[in-house]
Design a protein with these regions (language model features):
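Short, Gly/Pro- and small/polar-rich lid/capping loops
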Residues: 39-73
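Helix-loop-helix
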Residues: 1-44, 87, 172, 179-185, ...
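Intrinsic disorder/low-complexity segments
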Residues: 32-36, 46-47, 61, 122, ...
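Soluble non-transmembrane domains of integral membrane proteins
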Residues: 68-323
Length: 601
């Protein structure tokens, strides 16, 4: 069956590939035929005519800034130990930011702010406005201060004496670029003293798969000094002052910070859904209300760097929350990550160089902390095993009378001092731990690019085999070995637990422990290898603990003797037990009455 399953997807994939190639060949042939019908001189003439019309329109729009309407793109670079910032004279804005300490999957330097445009509207003449991003500024020479920071100014001046000055300053060991905007003649350049700022952004793939990175991308912002975010195709209108807006990818972010707040604005964000390397596009419109004065200044800052919790914490209030340690329905795991997982992880990373071993130590720490509950669970399981013969006798006695069996079973548990739900506590505890680690491993940049054993990157899935087709239900076109080890150890735990518990008569319950590990195969195959490695180690520890505790620590004869002793001691029923038994007795009476009532023919 498995061979047929894989063969089907391989054959389907081959057919689709052939069909795409055939369609492309047809399109190429049509394009070549159409190109032959167009004369070269007609193409040149059309281009010249289009350029002339475009230039005339730009000059007209620029009005008093007509000299800045046309120009040639030139760039200037500011650098420190962490980043290299390329500035362009067109718009006097940032063209790109290269992060020196981070690389992409193909070993190229990580670049941010590549498909960005930042600018604002200025009055250029009567009833005419232009975007600053369309005007050509004149750059000054670079200046270097005693503290090691470098600065440059971009200036444009109008025929009426107004001017715009952009000053950029890059400080040592910083991912933040200071951007000061000075408007000379602001009362003429702005309408009603409002600076309407526009930021157009488009993010591209930096991690292994664009699809997964899209899921991890979002827009974060601080409105009214409170953190919030949007992660679906959405539009957000700001009703309170905004401190910063951030375009976030899985491990990096580009954040625009207003040192004196944006007064209002809106952001529109949407993910791409095609097969390209593009992730999302954003249009952010922000307003800054300036005093009605001849000259005005706006202090901004552009952060382009890693989503590192400690770095962002020092950057601006609430910016560290860009790192997703748990949000929405998983917000309850954020304190676990912030106050337990992250400090312990960083502590181990302080003296262990390989992050795979750090994950192992973190796993052992978690299992050590939860060990009292684990022991309690195994003890409860041992008590249930000791009571199995008596439970079988009760079950045989009551037969199909489920109500009677349940009442007698509860009585037996109470007399023996057994909590039937005692074994569930560690399993329930694993739920918040799993979701906490899922958020942590997907957002902790220290894991990015870190190799361990056969995994090349602990922040992404490991690959031991690439398939010629893609398996649905989230499995993908690869096989992760850490996923296989996690699933196999989960199967072993299920087999061991089934051998220690009474046999289930219900076929669905009987096979349920085996179904869950199989489901993990599809859930885990695309998750970070750090998470599947954690799960593997945790399962191995579980198997070891079960074997040692059940065979060398827990004495079943002693447990039976203790339970027999407890039965001799009269126990007062709790209010909950009394109510529960009354409810069961009422249900039994109703069932007996229903069974005695003759059915109508």
């Amino acid at each position: 069956l498995g061979i047929l399953f894989f063969s089907y997807f391989w054959y389907t994939n081959q057919q689709q590939t052939a069909l795409v190639a055939f369609k492309k060949q047809q399109e190429d042939s049509t394009a070549k035929a159409q190109a032959k019908l167009v004369k070269p001189q007609d193409v040149v003439a059309a281009k010249i005519d289009s350029l002339q019309r475009d230039s005339i329109a730009k000059i007209a729009t620029a009005g008093n800034f007509a000299k800045a309407a046309l120009g040639k793109d030139t760039t200037v670079t500011l650098e420190n130990d962490l980043i290299s910032v390329v500035l362009t004279n067109k718009g006097g804005q940032v063209k790109s930011v290269t992060l020196k300490k981070y690389t992409t999957q193909d070993s190229a330097a990580v670049k941010l702010v590549q498909q960005n445009q930042m600018g604002y509207a200025v009055n250029t003449a009567d009833n005419k406005t232009a975007q600053s991003s369309d005007l050509y500024f004149t750059p000054s020479t670079l200046t270097k201060a005693q503290d090691g920071s470098t600065s440059i100014k971009f200036v444009i001046a109008s025929a009426t004496g107004t001017s715009i000055i952009h000053t950029y300053t890059l400080r040592p060991n910083s991912y933040a670029l200071d951007w000061d905007i000075e408007l000379v003649g602001a009362n003429q350049l702005l309408t009603a003293g409002v600076l309407n700022f526009t930021w157009l952004s488009e993010t591209s793939q930096l991690e292994r798969t664009a699809e997964y990175e899209r899921q991890m991308s979002n827009i974060c912002f601080s409105e009214g000094n409170e953190f919030d975010y949007i992660s679906a195709n959405n539009e957000k209108t700001f009703e309170k002052p905004v401190q910063w807006v951030s375009v976030v990818q899985q491990f990096f972010n580009t954040t625009l910070i207003a040192k004196n707040n944006f007064n209002s604005g809106a952001v529109n964000w949407s993910r791409y859904t095609d097969s390209s390397s593009k992730l999302a596009k954003t249009e952010t419109n922000l307003q800054i209300k300036l005093p009605q004065a001849a000259n005005s200044k706006v202090a901004l800052q552009l952060f382009a760097g890693p989503s590192d919790f400690e770095i962002l914490k020092k950057q601006a209030p609430e910016m560290e929350r860009i790192v997703n340690l748990g949000r929405d329905m998983y917000s309850f795991v954020r304190p676990i990550n912030k106050y337990i997982i992250m400090p312990v992880f960083d502590f181990f990373a302080g003296f262990v160089s390989n992050y795979g071993w750090v994950v192992l130590l973190l796993t052992l720490f978690i299992r050590l902390v939860t060990s009292p509950l684990t022991y309690s669970s195994y003890l409860s399981g041992a008590k249930m095993k000791v009571l199995k013969p008596e439970l079988d006798t009760i079950k045989k006695k009551f037969g199909d009378d489920q109500q009677g069996f349940a009442m007698e079973q509860m009585k037996l548990f109470r007399e023996a001092g057994v909590n039937p739900l005692g074994g569930c506590i560690p399993a329930l505890l694993q739920i918040p731990i799993f979701f906490a680690l899922y958020s942590f491993f997907n957002s902790h940049i220290a894991l990015r690019g870190q190799a361990f054993l056969w995994s090349k990157d602990l922040s992404s899935y490991d690959v031991i085999a690439t398939l010629p087709f893609s398996i649905p239900l989230g499995f993908g076109d690869h096989i992760s070995l850490f996923t296989i080890t996690a699933v196999l150890t989960s199967f072993l735990i299920s087999i061991y637990n089934m051998s220690m518990t009474p046999t289930q008569d219900n076929p669905a319950l009987k096979y349920m422990p085996y179904i869950f590990p199989f489901m993990l195969l599809f859930i885990f195959n695309r998750l970070p290898s750090a998470l599947t490695w954690y799960y593997t180690v945790s399962n191995i520890v579980t198997l070891g603990l079960q074997f040692v505790i059940q065979n060398y620590i827990i004495n079943h004869d002693k447990i039976l003797a203790q339970m027999d002793e407890k039965r001799k001691t009269p126990k007062a029923k709790s209010k909950w037990q009394t109510r529960f038994e009354q409810m069961q007795q009422s249900q039994k009476k109703l069932q007996d009455l229903k069974d005695k009532t003759p059915k109508k023919k």
